[in-house]
Amino acid sequence: MATELKEYLVIIPDLPDVLAKRQVLLKPHNQDAAPLVKAGRVPFFGSTLAHHSAEGQQVAENGTVMIIKAESEEEIKEIIRKDIFTIEGVWDFGKLSIWPFKSK
């Protein structure tokens, strides 16, 4: 019998001064995450911003927010731990926040 997946709101900030590295790693990060998105395990994701940028200016991304469907918080930590953004030093794993969540 499969364990029921629960929803979690996941917020993980970037380490300081990694915007250029984030941009270089974005394509492989998205490719690695695609199976989770396609399977419906990550129904929502996006970047947090230091501030809203004017049109034509570089977006000031400074982290990620997402909803992940998982069996446990430990499973989410393992997903984040294996992500290229964590491995290559974009995300600040020590500041990972995981909140039980219910979509409406």
Curated annotation (Swiss-Prot):
Concerning what turns on (or off) its expression, the entry says: Expressed under high amounts of nitrogen via regulation by AREB. Moreover, components of the fungal-specific velvet complex VEL1 and LAE1 act also as positive regulators of expression. Finally, the pH regulator PACC acts as activator of FUB expression after the pH shift to alkaline ambient conditions.
Q: How is it used?
A: Fusaric acid is phytotoxic to plants such as cotton and banana. It has been shown to induce programmed cell death in plants. In addition to a mild toxicity to animals, fusaric acid exhibits acanthamoebicidal, antioomycete, and antimycobacterial activities.
User: Mind telling me which InterPro entries this protein's record contains?
Assistant: Dimeric_a/b-barrel (IPR011008), Sec-metab_biosynth-assoc (IPR051807), YCII (IPR005545)
| Top-level taxon in the UniProt lineage | Eukaryota
Upon gene disruption, the observed phenotype is: Impairs the production of fusaric acid.
Biochemical pathway: Mycotoxin biosynthesis
* Function description: Part of the gene cluster that mediates the biosynthesis of fusaric acid, a mycotoxin with low to moderate toxicity to animals and humans, but with high phytotoxic properties. L-aspartate is suggested as fusaric acid amino acid precursor that is activated and further processed to O-acetyl-L-homoserine by cluster enzymes aspartate kinase FUB3 and homoserine O-acetyltransferase FUB5, as well as enzymes of the primary metabolism.
**Family membership:** Belongs to the YciI family.
Protein name according to UniProt: Fusaric acid biosynthesis protein 2
Q: Which organism is it from?
A: Gibberella fujikuroi (strain CBS 195.34 / IMI 58289 / NRRL A-6831) (Bakanae and foot rot disease fungus)
Q: Which gene encodes it?
A: FUB2
